[in-house]
């Protein structure tokens, strides 16, 4: 009230002081009362109303002059953009006439003009400021000021621009005011109509539905459904008029986030598909497949066709389950009417009435079975229609391009025809048009993905460089180890070793050797099993027996004991072998470079197997397996393993009085790459060496039964330790022996 009284007092007191004010160049600080600051004029004023109208008229003339000066300045400074001046003029025409005749607009114009003249480089900044002010005071925004503006407009003494501006402003204000009043009336009418529909729906819900009305097209249930659809349309229209959101918080309106695949681009595309605005449409398998294909093509994922189909099938199942859950929850929350508002779970009559509960269960099972029948019926109909469409497409294919039509036909068959089977080629234009918002989102997503890809490429390149350096270091270490082994082997070669010759050139001497070895094995096969049993204790007395033990073992060792030793060698790594087995395995694993020999059946060679079951080109130097070593030989590990083994075998053969020429083989790359370990540690680290196989095979089992049978024809037997040594069989053999 104090502010209003002060304004009235200022209007009464300042009428006589208005003539003493200098002019519009020094306006008062209060723009709310522009009629109090009338510029100097020669006309006498008789009343306050005439002085206020004269002041507004003078402000309007001054504002028009200032605006024309600003437009002239803009024409000179914005010659490259001629659309600036018409834009400013249109903004000024749309502004309210009361604001155009105000001191506030005069202040803004004078300030903008002076700054634009002093700083021409910032002209567009001041143009933007003026446009913002004119837009804020446009006639559409200030509808309540329209009657005052029209009444305060003088009819005469207007510049030539007023007839073109004032009638348009009056027309716009006259058209806008009825529109606002009409929208208010429309809002009230829609609200009344909504209340009427709600009351009618409640009445129909309270009415009982007879079985005879089920087939009636105008039953109460159908009337209620029609009224509900109208109610939803009215509610949407009412939200548009009130400029508010139409969301009600239902479960079906909630957005479903999707993270089902490992590709975020595909996840975003599927999430947009299932959360598309509009009616709640359930996506088809073809829709999901098209979304996956578009995401893969747009972002160049490089996925094969089969993987895209599997991904689309998984996504379709996941999306379908989640949409069904959302619909089910929405039905639960919105099921019923005002009659069921007072329902509580504890007052269910089926809890106290077993007959009612049984009847409800029967009805539920019947409803589910009928629902499955309906779904299967229409699924079969859809499959038939799709099969017919595919046959039509095949018939349309031209006969001339039959040789080249295999790939397009396969593409048409595999282009999204899955469980529900909509082909991706049938409606290619349905998902092509996208909104501007989606394009903006995709552009932003592409930028983010490019940045992430650059970071990942940088990290991958660093990791690759580190791996290359590590591999180079390992390669250098292996080369050094190979050189050391070769140097050691060359230095320890004895002059008694025969020259290296291939087994193919020495087939004739090998036949004679095979005969002598066959006679020796025939002698060995006649040994009784009692002589085989003390084999294990003999290894314990190795210190006292010395070299005589080696001769005994060479003569008494049978193929069965050889097989047993082979199976002991192939035990798993986690087993702890006995001291006897350690002697056997250590003596065998010391042969890093074994020698080739000929079998009793005339075979050229028997290959050994590596630790993982692979066949290596190493061959034995004698038909008998390596003998057990004494502890003295174990302790002296200075000389290379291969040469010590060769010299030991030679000493045994010389004592027996036999001279068997050995055929050395070239060193294998596997043995050169394997590091040389001490004989005492070879059992603890079996992965560094080779697991060698003995000479016994399936043919030796037959020879043991018929010792004097004729030797079979020459052949090469390659046995794999990984295939013939089963842990279960090892346990059985060890128990039986």
Curated annotation (Swiss-Prot):
Where composition is biased (Acidic residues), the residues are 435-489
Sites of the modification N6-acetyllysine?
511
- The segment annotated Necessary for interaction with USP7 and ATRX runs over 1-159
Its subcellular locations are: Cytoplasm; Nucleus, Nucleoplasm; Nucleus, PML body; Nucleus, Nucleolus
Which parts of the sequence carry Phosphothreonine? 459
Output the Gene3D superfamilies linked to this UniProt entry.
1.20.58.2170, Daxx helical bundle domain
Residue ranges annotated as coiled coil are: 179-216, 432-474
Chain intervals for the UniProt region annotation (Interaction with SPOP): 624-737
Q: Output compositional bias ranges, type Polar residues.
A: 149-175, 422-432, 517-527, 678-713
Domain of life of the native organism: Eukaryota
Q: Where is this region: Necessary for interaction with USP7?
A: 346-567
Phosphoserine modification, residue list:
25, 212, 412, 424, 494, 497, 558, 578, 665, 668, 685, 699, 734, 736
Its Gene Ontology cellular component terms are: chromosome, centromeric region; cytosol; nucleolus; nucleus; PML body
- Please tell me whether the keyword Cytoplasm is annotated for this protein: yes
For region Disordered, the annotated ranges are: 1-55, 145-184, 382-556, 569-719
Q: Does the keyword Lipid metabolism apply?
A: no
**Compositionally biased tracts (Basic and acidic residues):** 579-592, 647-657
Q: Where is this cross-link: Glycyl lysine isopeptide (Lys-Gly) (interchain with G-Cter in SUMO2)?
A: 142
Q: State the Gene Ontology terms under molecular function.
A: histone binding; nuclear androgen receptor binding; p53 binding; protein homodimerization activity; protein kinase activator activity; protein kinase binding; RNA polymerase II-specific DNA-binding transcription factor binding; transcription coactivator activity
Q: How is it modified after translation?
A: Sumoylated with SUMO1 on multiple lysine residues. Polyubiquitinated; which is promoted by CUL3 and SPOP and results in proteasomal degradation. Ubiquitinated by MDM2; inducing its degradation. Deubiquitinated by USP7; leading to stabilize it.
The annotated regions of Low complexity compositional bias extend over 33-45, 528-547
Where is the motif named Nuclear localization signal mapped on this chain? 390-394, 626-632
Official protein name in the record: Death domain-associated protein 6
